Amino acid sequence: MAKRIMQGVVVSDKMDKTVVVLVERKVRHPLYGKIVRQSKKYKAHDEENQYRTGDMVMIQESRPLSKDKNWVVTERTAVAVEG
């Protein structure tokens, strides 16, 4: 089975070797047909602690690394703007 890949924003980098990534997707409401945004947070492995809050990253599904962590950060697509 192919590993899923998602894009999201790092919302927390306070843990060692772990970041929390917020992934948003658009879904059509089953009854009313309106497009609504759904978001979910994923814990992802960050081996070198190189990703910071606000970075746009790609995460890929992996084997379970801990109780809550099943994803690995593969690349940074946009750097956070400091200010």
From Swiss-Prot:
Superkingdom in the source lineage: Bacteria
Keyword RNA-binding part of the UniProt annotation: yes
TM segment ranges: none
One of the GO BP terms on file: translation
GO cellular component assignments: cytosolic small ribosomal subunit
SUPFAM superfamilies (UniProt xref): Nucleic acid-binding proteins (SSF50249)
Keywords of this entry: Ribonucleoprotein, Ribosomal protein, RNA-binding, rRNA-binding
Gene Ontology molecular function: any one: structural constituent of ribosome
Keyword Lipoprotein in record: no
Family, per entry: Belongs to the universal ribosomal protein uS17 family.
Subunit structure: Part of the 30S ribosomal subunit.
Function: One of the primary rRNA binding proteins, it binds specifically to the 5'-end of 16S ribosomal RNA.
Name of the protein this chain belongs to: Small ribosomal subunit protein uS17
Species name: Magnetococcus marinus (strain ATCC BAA-1437 / JCM 17883 / MC-1)
Gene symbol of the encoding locus: rpsQ
